[in-house]
Structure formats: C-alpha cells, structure tokens
Amino acid sequence: MSVLKKNLAGRLLIARDAVKKALNSIPCDVAGVYKMLGANGLVLYVGKAKDLKKRLRSYYNFNQMSDRILAMVGHITELDVIVTQSEAEALLLEAQLIKTLKPKYNIIMRDDKFYPYILLSKHEYPRIVKYRGRKEAGLGKCYGPFISSLVVKLVISALRKAFQLRSCSDNFFASRDRPCIEYEMRNCSAPCTRKISEEDYAKSVHMAHKVLTGKSKELQRELFDSMRKFSDNLDYESAMVYRDRLQALKSIQECVSFQTEMSCDADFVSIYGRSGTYCLQVISFRGGISYGSQPYFVDDGNYESESDVLGMFMLQVYSDPPGRVYVDCESDYCEVINAALERLLTRKVDILTAKSHEELKFLRLARNSAMEALNRRLRDKALPAELEELAELFGLPNPPERIEVYDNSHISGTHPFGVMVVCGKDGLLRKEYRKFKIQTVLNGDDYSMMHEVLFRRFSEESPSVPDFVLIDGGRGHISSAIQVLGDLGIPFACMAKGSNRNAGEEVFYLPDGRKICLDPDSKLMLYMRKIRDEAHRFAITSHRSSRDRTLSSAVLCDIPGVGSARRRALITYFGSIDGVKRARTDEISKVPGISIKLAQRIYAYLKQGMAQP
C-alpha cells in the first residue's frame, strides 16, 4: 500500500459511501454528468459518461487508481448526478460546468490569451500585425487563428520585407512628417509621408492577402512574369524589387512545414495516450498552408477513452475552430462532438473522419507526432515511486510536486550566471526556468554567487514555492543556502561529485551535517543525476551565450568609423553579428549611415581580420 493510500484510508471510506449513494439513484444505461463535491460543497471534479452507472462503479476500485485520482477521491463527501438526454448533451454540459465552476482537478486547456491571428487593419493604408482577441466588426481582415505564434511573427516579417507594409499604430502613422527607420531598412514603403500612392499600396496589400489565403503559387507566377518583363525592358531596378519579393515568398515557404491542395481552413487532430497521460497533436492549415503543429497534454486518468479526451478538448480549446476538423476517432463519436459544437457555436463546424489519401496522411503525421511528444514527456517525468523515495530519503512529509535545481557557471569570474531549473511529477517545466546574471560577486566566489541567486529568487513574491531544492555543489554551499532557506523552512540538499568527479560517486550533503550516498544505479540516483545535469547544461549554455555576445560585439568595436550607433544599426539590420559577417559589401552599404567606403572596410575587416586603410 502506498504512503498516500495509508494517509487517506479513512477518507476513502467516506468517498465509497458517497459513490454508493449516487449509484442507488441512477437508472441503468443513461448518459449524464457527475460532480464530485468536497467539504462545504466545493466542486472538485466534473465528468461526463455515456453510461453513468458504469463510470461511477470505477471509483470503487482504489487499487487501480493513480495517486492523483486517489488524492481527489479522498476528498469526496458527496456526488451530484445530472442525467441528460444524450451523450452530446452530456459533453456540452460538462464543458459548460468546467468553464463556470473551474474545479480543482479538471484539466482546463483553454488559452485565455486566444490563438494569434495575422491582421490587415481597416485603414486606407492597412497595417499588418499579430493580433490576439475576438474578431470584431471594423477591425479589419483577420487570417487564422494559427497555432504557432513564432511562425506568425516570421511570416509577418517576410511579408513586410516583400511588400513593404506598415506595422505602426495609427497614431504613430498620423504623427509622421518624415519616414522612420523601417523605410530605410526597406520594411515599409512610408505611406505616412505619401512615398507610395494609395492605389499602389492597395496592390501590395492584395498580394499579401493572396499569400495568406494560400495563393502563393499563383502570386509567384505573377511576380516572376513581372520581373522578367522589367528585365527585358532593361528596367533592372524594378526587376530587383520583384526578385526580392520572390525571395521573401520563398522564406515564407521555409517557415511552413508543407502545403496541401486543400483550399479550405482545416485542422488535423490526433490523440495518443499511455500511463494515464494523453497527447493531442494539432496540425493547422490555413488557406492550404500549414502554419505549424502544437501538442496538448492531459494528465487525467478519469477519462474512459481517448474519444472522451478528444471531446473535452474540442469543447474547451476550440473557441474559434476552422470550418473542418479531421479527427481519428469513430464516426459515431464525431456526430456526438458535432452535435455539441452546434449548440455551443453560432456557426457550423464539420468534425470529420479522414477518407482521402491526403487526409489520412496528415492524420498519420499528427498521430506519429503525438506518440513522439508523449514518449518524450514520459521520459522526463518522475515516477511516483521515485518521488516517494526522494521524500523518504530527505524527510519530506509528502512526495514533492515542485523541485527547483540551482547551478552556477563562469570562467575565472567572467560572465557569471546562476540558473534555476524546475521539475516535478510532470517532468522538466522549461517555461519556468530562470537565469540570474550575477551582479554583486566579481571574484568568482562560487559560494557567494549561489547565495546571491537564492537570495534574489526567494526575496521576491512568488506564488510557486518549491517542496524541495537541490543545489549543484558541495559541503561549502550548505552555509550559503542555510542563510536564505533556513528561515523559510524549505528543505534542500547539495549534490556534489565524488573525489574523482566521476558520475556514480555523487554525495548528498544535508543542512543537519549528514552525508548520504545512493546506489549509483538506483532509479532515484539516475533521476537526481538527470535533473542535476539539466541544470548544469542550462548554466553552461547561459554563460556561453553571454560570453559569445560580448565577444561578437567586440569584433565591430575595433573597426574605425563604426561607433555604437552604427554597430546597433548593423546588428538591427542583419539580425546578428553572424548576419553581418555573411553580408556582401553592397548589402552592408544599404544600412542607414553606412557609406560604400565604410561598407568595404567592414567587409574586409570581417573577412580578413584587418581593416583596410
């Protein structure tokens, strides 16, 4: 019997009585929704079932439950059941109750920030920007929603380079009496100062519209024909404009994964589950172009089948779905989801099973991606047994849900960085990683650096407090950590390599003076080594990145005639020092403030390692 089950033994008997009472009031073979209530009527969980009686019986068998489900069931004092006319009605009611009640143990996957759109605003000179929010009348033309925010950013950047569309606010646009630096960098045609007519600007907007509606091939042919026509007429300057637009279109195609012959907007959604965890992979097409894919994870063993998880996902996440969504589930359940969505939305969405070769291909791709993503996530996860063993080893009252790992990196005190890596039962939580640029320690004192990092982390107000802290360090780090963590009551340990600094000889130092050694091949030791190594990797990467930025900037500092303003203009124009190094002389001379002569000097210095006289 697990530690958790022992602690909850009395509560589980109360929960079993609540389940039994609910079962006695439910007829057989009916669909519906059930609410698990805790103390003071607090709603803990909302679920739905095609067969309510069969579903509730599953809460009798405590031996088959995960620790997460046991913890939830252990707080049940009452079950409230609502019988519905159909499974579709149950699915819709479940989604509405979850949205309204926000139960503690339900997985709510909705992104309150909304998915990003590409917006061409309603204006005589429309601007192109990334937009999040509801589509409203008078806003302009929205393209999307798209899954990948990064790809949207890259596509907008490429479209601006291709068609010189503005991105500034209307207030900034109205206040200009001369072009800004975006015009100098050829990202904008400066309509604010009428450098382009409204008619010509509208043509550029129309070309961007073609790209965003999947008509890139048609546009490419038009641009190529125009380029050849200008070239035949010896108008090489105009031909170069169309050449640059063709190159920008190619860069957009590099951003997207692949294209399809389908002209409609569609998503392909596949699900894969293992060990009580599910991954839903969404591949999104807009105008026949794929703008990326996104995995969604659900850690919830309450669901009876993958189809149930899929139904929950559709109603919680899809606030604005495309016209077609292809899923890999039974066609009967597609009808259930369709019926629920029709009542939820004001427009029709088709939930379909794949039939054509192309549809099946993209669903298989989504399925394979879901399998890879879930297997990768499960490899990173800590098994409950490992966390229970960690709690027992270091005297924690419960298995830790949040572990923070700290490490420093520097070379002789230069470019010092401290880092925080976060992990728990769900694996490595990379979005919560943090870097600390050391500010007060100048002599490479590792103990003082660790003190600064911990002090800065725990001096701030944070809703996330770790259950356990692991420090990559030895006995000497104990005093630095006690000064910060001692009064807070946060348990910690320092993990040091052995005398020969070999893996497998690690030692744990505790604040009470104890020293612990583990079996080098034990699962707990392998887990501790994995999270320690992740912190070490992150620290080294942060240090190297800082060092490389400094060294790269120093390269331009030594070129006569290149001061801070020109250095900044070069890096802004080309995106990085590497971009400057790859540039030709004629490209460098296009940067505002860089003459042909200075461009030649910069090019020669970067290529040969010396400035020309």
From Swiss-Prot:
Localization of this protein: Cytoplasm
BP-aspect Gene Ontology terms: nucleotide-excision repair; SOS response
Domain UVR: 217-252
Gene Ontology cellular component annotations, sorted alphabetically: cytoplasm; excinuclease repair complex
UniProt keyword DNA repair, yes or no: yes
Domain named GIY-YIG: residues: 29-107
InterPro entries documented for this protein: GIY-YIG_endonuc, GIY-YIG_endonuc_sf, GIY-YIG_UvrC_Cho, Hlx-hairpin-Hlx_DNA-bd_motif, RuvA_2-like, UVR_dom, UVR_dom_sf, UvrABC_protein_C
Keyword annotations: Cytoplasm, DNA damage, DNA excision, DNA repair, Excision nuclease, SOS response
Keyword Membrane on entry: no
One GO molecular-function entry: DNA binding
UniProt xrefs under Pfam families: GIY-YIG (PF01541), HHH_5 (PF14520), UVR (PF02151), UvrC_RNaseH (PF22920), UvrC_RNaseH_dom (PF08459)
Alphabetized NCBIfam families for the sequence: uvrC
Family classification: Belongs to the UvrC family.
Subunit note: Interacts with UvrB in an incision complex.
Record's function text: The UvrABC repair system catalyzes the recognition and processing of DNA lesions. UvrC both incises the 5' and 3' sides of the lesion. The N-terminal half is responsible for the 3' incision and the C-terminal half is responsible for the 5' incision.
Name under which the protein is recorded: UvrABC system protein C
Protein's organism: Anaplasma marginale (strain St. Maries)
Recorded name of the encoding gene: uvrC
